[in-house]
């Protein structure tokens, strides 16, 4: 009973495995024929009917499979070798070895019996299928096989032709994968040939009942000589889902689909990067150095020219000087933006160097640098030409400007001369000198009546550029500080003269006798009367107030006192002359 139990467990394992494969019908196409699985005879025949249109008699294989599965024997694996099997009969205690020998050359009795049985019943499948890179041989006599091919980029194929029982290989590979303790997916059904070369493995499989011809590169990874993958196998912690997810990635690879991350993990990254740096970066650096040297030479020449223009000893007009200042400011802005663009392009170049595979963009950046330097050079040349034109025009019209300035300085009036003589650094207090001069002239012209009317105030405000209130305030202050002291001084002089005349007139009649007036005396009287009449006419002409009280000094004037005015005519003449000299 203990010997029968392993058979039932093994059958349950086979059924579970077949159901699991049926749950994923697209694994053959999704994994791109990269797994080799050898199911039982019935599944193998179905696969051959789908892939190769060859008529196969299924009833014969069903009978042979039934007889083989109903054999009263138990199959056990030899722990010393993974491909050595023992078939133990339940009725006989002896154990017969039905696996390969150590050399893998001669099959055992059961394999011979089954192969003879299959070959006698059906002679359709005669030779294994060899699939290479170029073509598939045109042969209709093909043994039961299952073909697994690589991708177009990996250029490798493996053909497995089976002439023995598929259950032995299936069970041996399944037990071997389960006993190893790690899940390898469907690669666990392949025998492990880690320590053998590809040629030796191919010779061993060709001489055995299971013929395998491996056509692959010799640089395949160690441990998987028949593996159709070029990637590293997944670790023990990674499951089958992770393997399928990594294998099902299709589509073009680019810089935005993880291409840079794949290149970073490659061992060819560093030598390829060095080679690209030698051929691209060095050439681009030479171009950039040449362009920078030429641009710097041009900049130095332009600076020399501009400095020559600006250092000219001839002064410029204010208008031309302003234009030249604006042009020089634009030149500084152009230089600043050129340096900024150059720095930005250098930053872009360094960012391209950090990403593998994008170093080929460096020559294009050098072309952009040359284009930018050419544009900025054109701007600088245009600015330099404008500055040169301004300097030439200023030098031509320099003599005319000097002559005009001299004429203005000579023709200018005294007010302009005084304004030029005042110091610029001294703070200005009060009204401007030109306005004060205009107001003072009007005051002396109207000295006898220094009260301007509204129209006079408006006219003076227009001439001086002051407001009407400023004109009124100035006249108020001028009458108090300037005009009133002058009038008081004149009045004191007149009063002194009158007193002196009175004293002299009172003394003379008492000393002289009453005689008849001589003709000379009459002539003096007529002269005095003439001077009196002329003074009265002058007072009427200037509009002097002839009332009893003066508006400013409140002095009484006797109109009838003609004698005093006649006796003081010589005194008044002296005072009037002094007043005229003061005003003039």
From Swiss-Prot:
One of its GO terms (biological process) is secondary shoot formation. Residues 295-305 have a biased composition (Acidic residues). InterPro entries: HD, Homeodomain-like_sf, KN_HD, POX_dom, TALE_homeobox. Residues 266-282 are annotated as: SR/KY domain. It is found in: Nucleus. Residues 292-317, 503-529 are annotated as: Disordered. Gene3D superfamilies: Homeodomain-like (1.10.10.60). Residues 424-486 bind DNA. May form heterodimeric complex with the TALE/KNOX proteins STM and KNAT1/BP. Belongs to the TALE/BELL homeobox family. This is BEL1-like homeodomain protein 8. It comes from Arabidopsis thaliana.
């Amino acid at each position: 009973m203990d010997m029968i139990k392993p058979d039932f467990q093994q059958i349950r394992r086979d059924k579970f495995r077949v159901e699991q494969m049926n749950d994923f019908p697209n694994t053959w196409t999704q994994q791109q024929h990269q797994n080799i699985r050898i199911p039982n005879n019935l599944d193998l025949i179905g696969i051959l009917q789908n892939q190769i249109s060859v008529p196969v008699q299924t009833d014969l294989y069903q009978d042979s499979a039934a007889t083989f599965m109903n054999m009263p024997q138990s199959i056990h694996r030899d722990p010393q070798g993974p491909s050595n099997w023992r078939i133990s009969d339940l009725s006989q205690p002896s154990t017969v070895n039905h696996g390969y020998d150590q050399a893998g050359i001669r099959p055992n009795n059961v394999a011979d019996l089954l192969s003879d049985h299959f070959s006698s019943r059906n002679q359709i499948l005669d030779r294994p299928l060899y699939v290479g890179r170029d073509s598939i041989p045109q042969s209709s006599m093909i043994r039961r096989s299952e073909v697994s091919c690589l991708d177009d980029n990996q250029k490798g194929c493996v053909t497995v032709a089976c002439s023995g029982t598929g259950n032995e290989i299936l069970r041996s590979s399944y037990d071997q994968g389960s006993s190893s303790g790690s899940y390898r997916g469907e690669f666990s059904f392949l025998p492990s040939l880690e320590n053998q070369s590809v040629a030796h493995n191919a010779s061993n499989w060709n001489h055995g009942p299971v013929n395998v011809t491996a056509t692959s590169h010799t640089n395949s990874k160690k441990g998987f000589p028949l593996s159709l993958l070029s990637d590293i196998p997944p670790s023990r912690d990674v499951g089958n889902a992770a393997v399928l997810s990594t294998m099902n990635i299709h589509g073009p690879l680019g810089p935005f689909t993880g291409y840079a991350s794949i290149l970073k993990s490659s061992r060819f990254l560093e030598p390829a990067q060095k080679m690209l740096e030698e051929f691209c970066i060095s050439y681009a650096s030479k171009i950039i150095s040449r362009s920078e040297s030429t641009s710097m030479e041009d900049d130095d020449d332009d600076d020399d020219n501009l400095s020559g223009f600006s250092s000219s000893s001839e002064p410029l007009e204010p208008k031309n000087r302003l234009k030249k200042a604006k042009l020089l400011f634009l030149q500084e802005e152009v230089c600043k933006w050129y340096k900024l663009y150059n720095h930005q392009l250098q930053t872009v170049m360094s960012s391209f160097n950090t990403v593998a595979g994008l170093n080929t963009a460096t020559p294009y950046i050098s072309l952009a640098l040359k284009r930018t330097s050419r544009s900025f050079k054109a701007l600088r040349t245009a600015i330099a030409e404008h500055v040169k034109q301004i300097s030439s025009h200023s030098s031509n019209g320099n003599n005319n400007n000097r002559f005009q300035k001299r004429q203005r300085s000579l023709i200018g009036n005294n007010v302009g001369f005084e304004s030029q003589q005042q110091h610029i650094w001294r703070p200005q207090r009060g009204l401007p000198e030109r306005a004060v001069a205009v107001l003072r002239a009007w005051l002396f012209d109207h000295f006898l009546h220094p009260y301007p009317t509204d129209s006079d105030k408006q006219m003076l405000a227009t001439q001086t550029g002051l407001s009407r209130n400023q004109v009124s305030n100035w006249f108020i202050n001028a009458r108090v500080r300037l005009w009133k002291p002058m009038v008081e001084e004149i009045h004191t002089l007149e009063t002194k003269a009158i007193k002196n005349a009175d004293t002299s007139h009172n003394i003379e009649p008492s000393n002289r006798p009453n005689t008849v007036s001589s003709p000379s005396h009459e002539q003096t009287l007529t002269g005095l009367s003439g001077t009196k009449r002329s003074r009265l006419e002058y007072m009427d002409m200037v509009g002097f107030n002839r009332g009893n009280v003066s508006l400013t000094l409140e002095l009484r004037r006797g109109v009838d006192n003609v004698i005093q005015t006649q006796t003081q005519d010589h005194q008044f003449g002296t005072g009037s002359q002094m007043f005229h000299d003061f005003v003039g």
